[in-house]
A protein has these predicted regions:
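Short, well-structured segments within or immediately adjacent to enzyme catalytic domains
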Residues: 40-232
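Short alpha-helix boundary/capping motifs
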Residues: 2-3, 59
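Phosphate-proximal small/polar/acidic motifs at interfaces that engage nucleotide phosphates
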Residues: 37
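N-terminal single-pass transmembrane signal-anchor helix
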Residues: 3-34
Length: 232
């Protein structure tokens, strides 16, 4: 009766090499699939936020939600920061679901990472006037919510090259517009291409889409026909 032949060292090394090659081929594909799933989930969250804002606007005679109001936040506030911020102002439509306000691509859900257009559409504290839907010339092209973060290269002219500062650990719930200097440069919370070559965006009319940050027109001044961050 023949005895079973044991693997030689060379055969074992060949098997290990084959496994390593297969893993090298599969892992990038799995990583891309995971990133795509995160981007889709983020877009779904953005859609729910967009619908909630439409609901809020309808209930408030066409007025947009403010970035933050100078009123005490609710006991179960999503953002217990002293004032009441837009995620809590939209609680009637969304409920207290913190995951909706967070991009799944971020490791820490408390980073949120979905921001409101500020100050062009979302005002800070109380102002003499409110932004209303009737103020928006092109609701279908005007971005109100999007992937946001604090940049480490705010003086970069090409928005597609903006990179989030890895040292920043705080939440990001707004993105600044170019008419918000000096804070636009000094505290550069902005839209960025979090999902490969695109950022997820929600528009005033309620629709959502993935778009390059450069296509939103942050390289253009207020009033430019390709500045899709302003009201004009």
């Amino acid at each position: 009766m023949k005895s079973k032949r044991a693997f030689t060292l060379i055969e074992l090394l060949v098997v290990i090499a084959i496994i390593a090659i297969l893993a090298g081929l599969l892992l990038p594909a799995l990583s891309r699939a995971k990133a795509k799933a995160h981007a889709s989930a983020c877009l779904s969250n953005m859609r729910q936020i967009g619908f909630a804002h439409r609901f809020y606007t309808d209930e408030h005679d066409g007025e947009f939600v403010q970035l933050t109001k100078a009123v005490r936040p609710p006991p179960d506030a999503i953002l217990p920061w002293g004032n009441t911020w837009w995620p809590d102002l939209l609680q009637n439509a969304l409920g207290r679901n913190t995951q909706i306000h967070s991009c799944p691509s971020l490791k820490d859900p408390k980073s949120f990472g979905i921001g409101m257009n500020h100050p062009e559409l979302g005002h800070y504290l109380e102002t003499a006037w409110k932004v209303k839907e009737s103020d928006i010339a092109n609701p279908s092209t005007t971005v109100i919510f999007a992937d946001s973060g604090l940049l480490k290269n705010p003086r970069e002219k090409n928005p597609d090259k903006w990179v989030v500062d890895p040292k920043f650990k705080g939440p990001s719930v707004y993105f600044r517009t170019p008419n918000n200097e000096p804070w636009y440069t000094d505290s550069p919370h902005r839209i960025h291409n979090r999902h490969g070559l695109t950022a997820n965006t929600a528009h005033v009319d309620g629709h959502v889409e993935a778009a390059r940050t450069s296509s939103i027109g942050f390289q253009y001044p207020l009033g430019h026909p390709q500045a899709y961050w302003d009201r004009q």
